[in-house]
Amino acid sequence: MSNGIVIIGSGFAARQLVKNIRKQDATIPLTLIAADSMDEYNKPDLSHVISQGQRADDLTRQTAGEFAEQFNLRLFPHTWVTDIDAEARVVKSQNNQWQYDKLVLATGASAFVPPVPGRELMLTLNSQQEYRACETQLRDARRVLIVGGGLIGSELAMDFCRAGKAVTLIDNAASILASLMPPEVSSRLQHRLTEMGVHLLLKSQLQGLEKTDSGILATLDRQRSIEVDAVIAATGLRPETALARRAGLTINRGVCVDSYLQTRNADIYALGDCAEINGQVLPFLQPIQLSAMVLAKNLLGNNTPLKLPAMLVKIKTPELPLHLAGETQRRDLRWQICTESQGMVARGVDGADQLRAFVVSEDRMKEAFGLLKTLPM
C-alpha cells in the first residue's frame, strides 16, 4: 500500500496544495502534520482585526475536522515534528512517526523580533494563534508602538490608528516601505499616515524595552524614550528552516528548491514562505498559489517547471491602498510619477525607457492590470 504524501504545515500553502492534489487524484493518501490547530483563516485579515473589532476565533473559516472530511485527509494538529529521516523516508514527532513516499515542507516563516533588551515584551501578529495570545492586551492598549515600517508595519499602523489608538511607528530607514519602493513613491502613503495621526520615527532605532507601572518604556537612540501600552514587531519574516537543516537539505535564506519545487533530496519538496525558489523567497499569495498548482502536478508524476509571471503585490491600507509590481526596489530606475487627487501612478523605467516597475494608488489602481501586461516576463 502507498504511504502517499506527507505535508508538514497547515497554512495557505499547504491548503492550496491539498486542493490542487485532490482536483487530480481523489484517493492518494494525504497526511498533514502541524503544530497549530489546523483551522483555516485568512492570514491577511490579521492586518485589520483591531479596527474591525474581530477576535481571533472570528477569523476561523473552516475547522480542521471539516477540512479533513472535505478533502479525505489524515490530520495531526498540535503536533511538533522533531526529525526527518530522509534515508528511511520517515517523519518523526515525540510520540509518533509517519512513512512517506513524497514529503512537502510547508513550515512557513516566523516573525523576526529585534534582539534588544526586553524583546520578550514585543508582540507579533503572524498567525491566528499569536493574535489569540495577545488580543486582550491589544484591544485594551491606548498607546501602541510598531517596530518596522514595511508592508505589514504600515498596514498595522493605519489599522490601529483607525481604531482610535495613539500609534508610533519606528524604522531605521528614511522612509516607509523602503525595501519595496523609493521614498518619492512611498511619500504619498507616508503623508497620509501622518495626517491620520501616526507618529513616524524614521531614521530611528529601538534600543530596549522595560516594563513600568504604567506601561512599557521604549528606549530609542539619541537619548529619546516613549511610554506605550503595547509593542508590535513588524520587522519581517524568517523562513522556518530548522527541520530542513536537520534533514541535511540545502538552506540559504529559505529551503532551497529548483523550478520543480524539489530540494536536493528527490523525495522532499518545499512550498510557501519557507521555500527559496531558485534564489528567491516569495512570501506573497499569488506565487504560492501558482507554486501549489505546479507542485501538485509534480507530486503526481508530472515534470512541470514553475514559471512565474509579473505579479501584483497589494498593500492593504484602506485610507490609501497601493498596488505594485515589477522590480520596484531597483536603484537604477527613473521614476515618472503622476499624482492627482484621485490617486498616483508611478512608472519605473530603465535606461532604455523600458517599464520595469510601477506603483498605483487609490482610484488609479484600476490601471494596474494594463501596466502589468507591459512588464517584461
UniProtKB/Swiss-Prot annotation:
It holds the Pfam family Rbx_binding. The keyword Oxidoreductase applies. Keywords: Cytoplasm, FAD, Flavoprotein, NAD, Oxidoreductase. InterPro entries: FAD-bd_OxRdtase, FAD/NAD-bd_sf, FAD/NAD-binding_dom, NO_rdtase_NorW, Rbx-bd. Pathway: Nitrogen metabolism; nitric oxide reduction. It is an enzyme of class 1 (oxidoreductase). It is found in: Cytoplasm. Gene3D superfamilies: 3.30.390.120, FAD/NAD(P)-binding domain. It catalyses: 2 reduced [nitric oxide reductase rubredoxin domain] + NAD(+) + H(+) = 2 oxidized [nitric oxide reductase rubredoxin domain] + NADH. GO terms for molecular function: oxidoreductase activity, acting on iron-sulfur proteins as donors, NAD or NADP as acceptor. One of its GO terms (cellular component) is cytoplasm. Its EC number is 1.18.1.-. Its cofactor is FAD. The keyword Cell membrane does not apply. It comes from the Bacteria. One of at least two accessory proteins for anaerobic nitric oxide (NO) reductase. Reduces the rubredoxin moiety of NO reductase. Belongs to the FAD-dependent oxidoreductase family. HAMAP family: NorW. This is Nitric oxide reductase FlRd-NAD(+) reductase. The lineage of its organism: Bacteria, Pseudomonadati, Pseudomonadota, Gammaproteobacteria, Enterobacterales.
